[in-house]
Swiss-Prot record:
Organism taxonomic ancestry: Archaea, Methanobacteriati, Thermoplasmatota, Thermoplasmata, Thermoplasmatales
Xref: InterPro entries: HAD-like_sf, HAD-SF_hydro_IIB, HAD_sf, PGPase
GO molecular function, one term: magnesium ion binding
Entry EC number(s): 3.1.3.18
Protein name: Phosphoglycolate phosphatase
Binding-site residues for Mg(2+), renumbered to this chain: D23, D25, D185, D189
Source organism of the structure: Picrophilus torridus (strain ATCC 700027 / DSM 9790 / JCM 10055 / NBRC 100828 / KAW 2/3)
Functional note: Catalyzes the dephosphorylation of 2-phosphoglycolate.
Root EC class: hydrolase
Pfam families: Hydrolase_3
This protein's record includes keyword Hydrolase: yes
Catalytic reaction equation(s): 2-phosphoglycolate + H2O = glycolate + phosphate
Active site: D23 (nucleophile)
Keyword annotations: Carbohydrate metabolism, Hydrolase, Magnesium, Metal-binding
């Protein structure tokens, strides 16, 4: 069958993409973390399998999964813990991050946040910007690292990131990297953007994420999803 160039690329996209991986804060939500109704509708219109990957905690992502209404994987705490086929799987421990936060809270402005009570593999905190070099160095000395989601700072174990989560899903589904579309906006999304999957971001994304993206939407804070899905011909 003869295809024009445009039809060929539409065919490639629709046959390639078997999983859409979505960040939450700044990708589905606005600056105040209010979820975009347009984002919810876009996800509900999508026939491709959807997964959420976030620095937030598993109970929050589980609530989003239920109330948005999709049947897919959820990876919380930047890939540290997941709900896979109704089973909770934990890939890292919180002992190191928790001990580190307790220690640095004694001599820096670092303070834990409310959701730490539900964290099982990481810790989250706020701190003065001018102390971050000290905090970063101390984290590295303990085989930990700090990542900024744009909303809070996360203390993570070595190897714990969203790229780890995407690799897990690729293995579970037995698909290739080019079968995956990732969408995110900030520093803690960079690990999944570096895998060689298809990638897109909203207009509010960091400059680094924009540079790493195959497609940058002109729309922001969740309103980009319809645009991105149309670009990859996942919805019409």
């Amino acid at each position: 069958m003869f295809m024009t160039k445009d039809l060929f690329f539409v065919y490639i996209f629709t046959t390639m993409i078997k999983l859409v991986v979505l960040d939450v804060d700044g990708t589905l939500t606005d600056k105040s973390r209010m979820i975009s109704v347009n984002a919810v509708n876009a996800i509900r219109n999508l026939k491709t399998k959807v997964a959420l990957v976030s620095g937030n905690v598993l109970p929050v992502l589980y609530g989003l999964k239920i109330y948005i209404g999709f049947d897919g994987y959820i990876f919380a705490e930047n890939g540290g813990i997941a709900l896979i086929n109704n089973n909770i799987e934990k890939f890292f421990e919180k002992d190191g991050p928790e001990s580190f936060l307790n220690d640095i809270s004694g001599y820096t402005s670092a303070r834990g946040i409310l959701t730490n009570r539900w964290r099982e593999t990481s810790m989250a905190f706020t701190a003065n910007h001018d102390e971050m070099d000290i905090i970063d160095r101390e984290a590295a000395s303990r085989d930990l690292y700090i990542v900024d989601s744009g909303f809070t700072l996360h203390i993570l174990n070595k190897g714990q990131d969203k790229g780890f989560a995407v690799k897990k899903m690729i293995d579970i589904m037995n698909i290739d990297y080019n079968n995956v579309l990732v969408i995110g906006d900030s520093q803690n999304d960079e690990s999944m953007f570096s895998l060689g999957t298809l990638s897109a971001c909203p207009g509010n994304a960091s400059e680094k994420i924009k540079e790493m993206s195959n497609y940058v939407s002109g729309k922001c804070y969740g309103d980009e999803l319809f645009d991105v899905f149309r670009h990859f011909d996942l919805i019409h």
